[in-house]
């Protein structure tokens, strides 16, 4: 059976939602994950501003990937987000986005993660906290 890191490295590129949004996993390991989402006109709300739901989805996916970024071989591969709080601090205007997810506390079943979403210029767009629950 593969480790959680190996599982998530295969999951993200094969996820229909990630494929649709263009979300790519660029780094994963040691309780950390980095994901990118390219700007697409389909993701805007007003003008060229990326919709908050797309940003939240990127943050949620980064938290999940960070939670899975360890060397545990799971008995039952599965889990879900138990909670997600997103604070939007700046608009994402016509920009590719990068999310960095970092585990801040890992328990037996629950994993708390902090996520920072930035635009292509490095400006922080959103900060998020997520709790991931393993099956």
Regions found by a protein language model. Give the residues of each.
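A generic structural signal for short beta-strands and their flanking turns/coil linkers
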Residues: 19-21, 31-33, 78-84, 95, ...
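Hydrophobic beta-strand-centered segment that forms part of the acyl-chain substrate-binding groove
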Residues: 50, 66-98, 103
């Amino acid at each position: 059976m593969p480790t959680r890191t190996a599982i998530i490295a295969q999951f993200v590129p094969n996820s229909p939602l990630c494929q649709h949004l263009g979300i790519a996993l660029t780094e994963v390991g040691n309780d950390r994950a980095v994901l990118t989402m390219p700007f697409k006109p389909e993701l805007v709300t007003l003008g060229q501003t990326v919709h908050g739901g797309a940003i939240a989805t990127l943050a949620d996916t980064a938290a999940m990937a960070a939670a899975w970024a360890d060397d545990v071989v799971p008995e039952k591969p599965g889990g879900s987000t138990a909670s997600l709080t997103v604070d939007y601090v700046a608009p994402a205007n016509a920009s590719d986005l990068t999310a960095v997810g970092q585990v801040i506390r890992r328990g037996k079943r629950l994993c708390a993660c902090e996520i920072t979403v930035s635009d292509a210029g490095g400006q922080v767009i959103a900060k998020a906290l997520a709790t991931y629950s393993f099956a």
